Amino acid sequence: MGTYRKRFNEKARSGHMAKLKELKRIRNKQFTRQDENDERVENPDSAPAESSTTEPNANAEILEPLTEEEKKMKKRKLQELFTPKESKVSRLKKKRLDKFIEHQLKREERKTIIGKLQDYKIDTSLLTSSKRLGEGRQTKKEEFKEALSLERQGRGNEQTNEILYEEYEPKVWDEYGEGGSSEDDDGEDDFEASFGSMPKPTDNEEKKSSGFIDHRPAKFGGSGLSFGFSNIKVINKESKTPKKKYNWRQRVEMEELKKHGKEDEMDFDTTSEDDDEEEDQEEEDKMHPSENPLEEVESADSETGSEKFDQNDVANEFKDWANQEIKKLEGRDQELVTPTLNIDYKPIIRKEDLDDGLQEAYVPINENSTRKAFYVEVSRSDEIQKARIQLPVFGEEHKIMEAIHHNDVVIICGETGSGKTTQVPQFLYEAGFGAEDSPDYPGMVGITQPRRVAAVSMAERVANELGDHGHKVGYQIRFDSTAKEDTKVKFMTDGVLLREMMHDFKLTKYSSIIIDEAHERNINTDILIGMLSRCVRLRAKLHKENPIEHKKLKLIIMSATLRVSDFSENKTLFPIAPPVLQVDARQFPVSIHFNRRTAFNYTDEAFRKTCKIHQKLPPGAILVFLTGQQEITHMVKRLRKEFPFKKNSKYNKDLETPVSKMGINSKTTDLEAEDIDFSVQVIDQDKFKSAIRYEEDEGNSGNGEDEEDEEEEGFEEVLTEGQTANDPLYVLPLYSLLPTKEQMRVFQKPPQGSRLCIVATNVAETSLTIPGVRYVVDSGRSKERKYNESNGVQSFEVGWVSKASANQRSGRAGRTGPGHCYRLYSSAVFEHDFEQFSKPEILRMPVESIVLQMKSMAIHNIINFPFPTPPDRVALSKAIQLLQYLGALDNKEMITEDGKKMSLFPLSPRFSKMLLVSDEKACLPYIVAIVSALSVGDPFINEFELGINEISRKPNPDENLDDKIREHDESTPGMDPELKKELRSKFYKSRSQFSKLDKFSDVFRLLSVVSAMDYVPKEQKEIFMKKNFLRGKLMEEIVKLRKQLMYIIKSNTSKENIAVVIRNEDLKSDIPSVIQIKLLKQMICAGFVDHVAVRADVLFPDDAKITNRTSIINIPYIPVLATRTPNIEDCFVYIHPTSILNNLGEMPPKYMLYYSLHLGGNNKTRMNTLCDIASTPLANIARKGLLLTYSKPLTGQGLKTVNLSPTERYCYVVPRFGSTVDNDLKIGWDLNPIAVHQKKQKGQWTVIKFITRKGFQTITGEEKEKK
């Protein structure tokens, strides 16, 4: 019979099953959880003895680990379990078995610990929410709620008992008849009669009595009232008398009394009656405790508050009584009576003492200032003093001067008309600025103005107001100066001060500088403020080191608007923000009236509105804002024609001025940039015709127009007595090119019985204050010079003004009384299209002149210069590139010797370069004349301004003549055809007379007329200019600039420059020779080397096809370095119609130099040509710059390279002008081959000089002879 075979791994399986049962038992144990205080014990027979001894309580606070004996016993049992009986075990197996047993023991211990942890559980309802962490102390309500919850859970302690339960002190009642009153007995009898007699407690009941009232129901052993606790021990305490209560005010008073050694007055705060009342109230509270503890707390708080209030009142009353008694005892109870004067006194009411509701501006005060008082006495007439008192800034003199004394930089904001321009310099002068014996400010007072007219007029007015010190006021502008050695107040343009800082950066002659009209933000103003900010800090530093030798410099920036954040908040400009003082202008209310619709033709709308104001509204001057000279001249003529003076009036002759005739053909001609509205679309034919009809039918308006007028606002007033709708209108123009004498007429009173009307540009916004203006007609537009950085085109564009400018214009109507401003645009356009402030000029103009001046002042890092508004980096890089082309800067952007010389001239760097290279073959006088003419402007009056342009010729198919030219004759019917023909003949004869020097060069026509003017006698100059159709004002400017340039050149080149005098005879020059003309073209090219254009058919014959019928003004050119586009026609530029080349009659030159590019009305870019240039001279001029590169030496066709040494050679190369060969983004072209002398420097062949053909042949022959 076979034996039973044990199953594989049976012992392990049995052990595993035992473990599972044990684990199941442990898990089921949590469902039979016993109470902690339960003393039941399991049956010892149901479990082995070890379990009762080894199984500890899982919920015990401390679990004791197994002892060493217990661990050994357990290990021995495991060994017996796994070791078979009577079997031999090898040493290795035994070692493995020990390791296994040790591992199993650790597993058992781990399972035991995990099982114990599973058995341990807590009630999560007892935990506190984490969201309440950090709340701090609990309120009484929260404490009571938590204590009640713990009590219900059976977890109460002494702390919860203190919160939930209150102690009750049993009161001992006296027996009846002992010490009691009859009133008390009566009260008790009444109580017994009402509620019955109270049962007396027995001795047992007294022992069981509790200090708490048991409010449980009667069936549970309570009193039957409510829930309560009867298991609280009774605490008997002796009754204590309530302590005297003090509030915090009484404690403070008590401490003060103790310090001063006085008696404690707190003893009088309460009385015995009050104490008795308090005791009775406390006893009553103990007898009837509140059910809600919170109500008890609140009631206690309210009672203590009322109690404190009552105690304070009692204490104060007693204190007052005690003080009165003390005064009686000391004899101080008698009242002193002040004697009264029987005089009628009227208090003086000063305007400055009244509260105006304005907040005073904060002005930092230098507490360490040691300035001594110093003033200059000035005597003025009563009339001038009264006029000064009426100015708003006069009342702010103290505040302004205090700010100036305590701060090196001050900003003053005041609208035009506040008097800041004329009064602030007088404040400074009277405070000692400019006085030689002044201890702190002995230097001059300098005032800069952006316009020459403002500098001259303000200097005259301040000199008049300074009375006996008026001779110490002078001005200095570009061509005129009245400043002397004793001048203490100097008005000047900002360019003059910039020039002075180049020679004296510290401005040692000045003690204060005033920058006026800073809100205009032109280039000179921005660069001045940036340099002066450094100068102020430098002078302050030097003054700190040596106060006697160096004095501080004060800088005052004045603006007509509140746009000063670029100055005050610019930490780079002013590390410490300067104080900003605001001066209110003398402003009356101004009613602003917007148009319902924005008129397309704003000039006609301005004319209609002006006529309506004159015919319907009371007296008052009218100020009309337009964009340019041509619009103003046309408007003046229309208004004078509509409201004329009588025929025999003397004012008719005064008002007779030539008026420009407008005739524009967009296809054949371009006027001057000032006369063209580049940003406004060309008016189409229908609107143009309707405008003409409106102009013709202006006087015959129908009923429909009257109905429209009635709907307009701002015409509620009526004419006054003596006024009629046909009164004459005294119309005057005002623009920058107008002579100063004509500009001053706006300040004169109009003739009797007429109304003043001024038609002006934005010059009248801030620079000049015109008196008597009550009505303002604002077109909302202005003409500004803009510069296109992408193509270098400058243009005058008409666009919307800023909101700040519009507010300035409207403010003109409120200077003398309430006024009206009529805006020729809608409020929607004003809010949507108008910018808040205009763009600074430094961001819309080329900055090469500024960069060169700053480089000459050793300001090399232009980026870090403290500009109020930093210029665009693209504009700066283009300016630096141009200066490198001209040779003013080297490759490292450092100024060269030529650049330093160029910076001495107050001109564009281009003109400075021309003057620098003009000292050859006696060409200097010619270059001076050319530069002066180009700087000032074209002095010729063109045929379109005269109205003599020929329109009877047959139209050219390429020109596409439209109806505008034909309608031009209709617009000028006053000129007789024969007279027009004769005038045209004289015009062309005059032009041909000045065009004989060179038929390809417009610049030599300018040279001819300027040189011819030198030989005309002084008394015949006016006739000469009229006869030759020249602008008198521009010719005078050209003569003055020539004298200034000659003076600068001679003073910097002659040895004795102090005695340099320029006379009119020094300006005379002979007719230039042929050689001089060739040299002059190269000198002009030196200044405009990057303004070279090549005829388009030379580079792109397929794209630019020129036929015999193509007019000269339609032949395209391409500028050098123009950006190459897929459509090459986008790069084309064309000759200006007023050029001398227009009457050439042959193909224009291959290469042309141009002065500037202008965008015409037909979207064609026109170039104002200067002269032609040949290939070799162009290469000779461009070789010093970065525009010329060279090919490798040419070989073949008899051309050989002559090697003088391994590092020197003579050869022919092909120069390339413009972009390099491998550059497809810019335009460039090859010039004619030329012989050069090259040397090898740093591994590259460099051109040293050019060699003529004869010179190269000579060198080649000499080399052959040597061989």
Curated annotation (Swiss-Prot):
Organism of derivation: Saccharomyces cerevisiae (strain ATCC 204508 / S288c) (Baker's yeast)
Role of this protein: Probable ATP-binding RNA helicase. Required for 18S rRNA synthesis. May play a role in restructuring of the pre-rRNA.
Positions of modified residues (Phosphoserine): S181
Domain Helicase ATP-binding: 401-580
CC per GO annotation: 90S preribosome; mitochondrion; nucleolus; nucleoplasm; small-subunit processome
GO BP annotation list: maturation of SSU-rRNA; maturation of SSU-rRNA from tricistronic rRNA transcript (SSU-rRNA, 5.8S rRNA, LSU-rRNA); ribosome biogenesis
Residue ranges of the motif DEAH box: 516-519
Domain Helicase C-terminal, residue spans: 675-858
Note: Present with 2000 molecules/cell in log phase SD medium.
Region (Disordered): 1-67, 168-233, 255-313, 693-720, 955-976
GO molecular function term, any single one: RNA helicase activity
EC number(s) reported in the record: 3.6.4.13
Protein name: Probable ATP-dependent RNA helicase DHR1
Assembly description: Interacts with snoRNA U3. Component of the ribosomal small subunit (SSU) processome composed of at least 40 protein subunits and snoRNA U3.
Protein family per UniProt: Belongs to the DEAD box helicase family. DEAH subfamily.
Keywords: ATP-binding, Helicase, Hydrolase, Nucleotide-binding, Nucleus, Phosphoprotein, Ribonucleoprotein, Ribosome biogenesis, RNA-binding, rRNA processing
Biased composition range(s): Acidic residues: 175-192, 264-284, 695-719
Top-level taxon of the source organism: Eukaryota
UniProt catalytic activity: ATP + H2O = ADP + phosphate + H(+)
Compositional bias per record (Basic and acidic residues), positions renumbered to this chain: 7-25, 32-43, 202-217
Annotated compartments: Nucleus, Nucleolus
Protein residues bound to ATP: G414, E415, T416, G417, S418, G419, K420, T421
